[in-house]
């Protein structure tokens, strides 16, 4: 095993994980018999504790990859090469499997109302009104286990919820639990029984039966986006509905070797879907289905990039990501990764999907989808007193075929709620800034090297390109790669903030924007009229 390479990959992964994935990983270690990690917030340090306990680097990597992938964490193909293809959490570490399974079950309940109802039910019936809003989801599942609500091979306490929300869940878990093998490489629970941390004290305050926003949702001062629920968005009249989070069980991962994808599959791929950040990739992968004749989406690490091959609507596609870290955002990494993917596949069309910032405050609202008919490259600018000027004055046109497909009729602005051409994504507020309906606009975007969060600087961008509806960071590079390979490209992104100094306040709009853009592209690629493109 290349320990140095693994350490480097884990350091990089640790920088990218959010607090939820750290909480889940910590819960899995608790299930594996590792104690005393309650305050640790670094994935890398948690992994070190795991590796110290197992004394087996490959086992520790296998365990880690399993946990992160189960909850939709992406960009792990290279690390997965060091994992064992035979690793089975359920048979080796049944307690950890139980805790992760129940967390996944509750986490996947959408919308928020369903999840809140389920947690209120568990709290009221089994936990004497324990206030589940006072802890995170993984912490609540730990309380459930410590109080005997769930046990290895026995989740019957959740039977009514399972039948209501996911009928197959009970049978799936019971089948796995039959295979449990308590001869784990980890220290067994019996061996550490005397050192087991006591169950958290249940506070006196009671969970009410009221359905409310969960802990961690935006404050009342900022209008909240609707919870998209890991892709639980439907297109009216569409034959494809995305209801489940992207899950490692849907993916073929090359463990130590690359799976050979047939030439027929490679030649049949006409679309490259490019994303930048993890949330953008997640929005696309949640809607990616296995290719016809396959049970799983294909995940590969080739030419130095992570690739995902599957079906998006009616079309086989390859999905790429250019920014695994914040430092990789921007035009140059996007161009580099796009070129690498184009060396492997020969798609006719490139679609960049993700999040942008709104430029035109009169017309563009948070959550709206922007279809770029042109990309104005503001990477090459001249800075003058009080203003900036684009040195490349001609904006790059998006592909005619793609613009024709994705732009909407009737002034390029149409509501996307309700009728046959509208997808079911509704905003919660009725004020002007966050208009209730998601709208689709078609017009120019600017592509900048900066992550813009300053109203004054945005005003300068607006003066440089007064026709621009939105701005983003990767489009210019993707358009350059498309030119090099003589293919069409387009940027379709949804507004996640207004670049006016309030990015932190808007942060909960970013997941919604990722879902909106991904869903809009899916809506059109699922149209029978696109089959012969």
Swiss-Prot record:
Its EC number is 3.5.99.-. One of its GO terms (biological process) is L-methionine salvage from S-adenosylmethionine. GO terms for molecular function: adenosylhomocysteine nucleosidase activity; methylthioadenosine nucleosidase activity. One of its GO terms (cellular component) is cytosol. The keyword Hydrolase applies. Residues 184-248 are annotated as: Disordered. It comes from the Eukaryota. Residues 218-227 have a biased composition (Polar residues). Residues 236-248 have a biased composition (Low complexity). Residues 1-262 are annotated as: Death domain. Keywords: Hydrolase. InterPro entries: Nucleoside_phosphorylase_d, Nucleoside_phosphorylase_sf. The keyword Mitochondrion does not apply. Residues 263-533 are annotated as: Purine nucleoside phosphorylase domain. It catalyses: ATP + H2O = D-ribose 5-triphosphate + adenine; dATP + H2O = 2-deoxyribose 5-triphosphate + adenine. The C-terminal purine nucleoside phosphorylase (PNP) domain cleaves the N-glycosidic bond of ATP, and to a lesser extent dATP, to release adenine and a sugar triphosphate; has weak activity on ADP and AMP and no activity on dADP, dAMP, adenosine, deoxyadenosine or other (d)NTPs. Has 2 domains, an N-terminal death domain and a C-terminal purine nucleoside phosphorylase (PNP) domain; the PNP domain has ATP nucleosidase activity. Expression of the C-terminal domain alone leads to cell death in E.coli. This is Death domain-containing ATP nucleosidase. It comes from Amphimedon queenslandica.
């Amino acid at each position: 095993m290349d320990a140095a390479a693994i350490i480097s990959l884990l350091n990089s992964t640790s920088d990218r994980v959010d607090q939820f994935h750290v909480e889940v990983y910590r819960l899995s270690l608790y299930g594996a018999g590792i104690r005393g990690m309650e305050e640790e917030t670094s994935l890398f340090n948690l992994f070190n504790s795991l590796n110290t306990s197992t004394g087996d680097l490959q086992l520790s990597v296998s365990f880690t990859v399993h946990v992160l992938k189960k909850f939709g964490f992406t960009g792990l193909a290279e690390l997965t090469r060091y994992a064992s293809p035979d690793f089975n959490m359920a048979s080796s570490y049944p307690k950890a499997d139980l805790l992760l399974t129940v967390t996944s079950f509750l986490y996947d309940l959408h919308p928020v109302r369903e999840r809140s109802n389920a947690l209120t039910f568990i709290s009221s019936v089994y936990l004497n009104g324990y206030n589940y809003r006072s802890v995170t989801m993984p912490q609540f599942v730990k309380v459930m286990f410590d109080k005997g609500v769930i046990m290895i091979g026995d989740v019957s306490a959740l039977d009514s919820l399972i039948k209501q929300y996911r009928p197959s869940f009970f049978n799936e878990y019971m089948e796995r639990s039959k295979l449990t093998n308590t001869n784990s490489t980890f220290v067994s629970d019996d061996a550490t029984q005397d050192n087991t941390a006591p169950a958290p004290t249940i506070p006196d305050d009671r969970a009410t039966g009221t359905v409310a926003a969960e802990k961690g949702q935006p404050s009342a001062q900022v209008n909240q986006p609707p919870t998209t629920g890991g892709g639980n968005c439907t297109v009216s009249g569409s034959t494809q509905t995305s209801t489940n989070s992207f899950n490692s069980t849907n993916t073929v991962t090359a463990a130590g070797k690359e799976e050979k994808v047939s030439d027929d599959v490679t030649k049949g791929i006409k679309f490259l879907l490019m994303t930048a950040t993890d949330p953008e990739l997640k929005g696309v992968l949640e809607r990616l289905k296995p290719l016809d004749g396959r049970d799983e989406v294909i995940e590969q690490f080739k030419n130095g990039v992570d690739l995902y091959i599957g079906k998006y609507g009616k079309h086989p596609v390859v999905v790429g990501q250019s920014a695994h870290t914040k430092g990789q955002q921007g035009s140059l990494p996007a161009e580099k990764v796009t070129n690498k993917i184009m060396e492997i596949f020969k798609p006719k069309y490139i679609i960049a999907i993700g999040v942008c910032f709104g430029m035109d405050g009169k017309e563009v609202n948070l959550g709206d989808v922007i279809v770029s008919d042109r990309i104005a490259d503001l990477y090459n600018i001249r800075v003058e007193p009080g203003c900036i000027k684009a040195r490349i004055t001609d904006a790059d046109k998006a592909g005619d075929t793609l613009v024709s497909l994705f732009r909407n009729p009737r002034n390029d602005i149409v509501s996307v709620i309700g009728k046959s051409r509208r997808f079911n994504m509704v905003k919660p507020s009725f004020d002007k800034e966050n208009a209730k309906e998601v709208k689709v606009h078609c017009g120019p975007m600017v592509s900048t090297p900066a992550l813009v969060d300053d109203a004054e600087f945005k005003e300068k961008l607006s003066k440089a390109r007064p026709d621009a509806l939105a701005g983003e960071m990767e489009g210019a590079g993707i358009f350059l790669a498309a030119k090099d390979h003589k293919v069409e490209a387009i940027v379709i992104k949804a507004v996640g903030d207004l670049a006016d100094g309030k990015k932190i306040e808007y942060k909960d709009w970013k997941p919604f924007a990722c879902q909106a853009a991904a869903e809009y592209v899916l809506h059109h690629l699922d149209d029978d009229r696109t089959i012969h493109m």
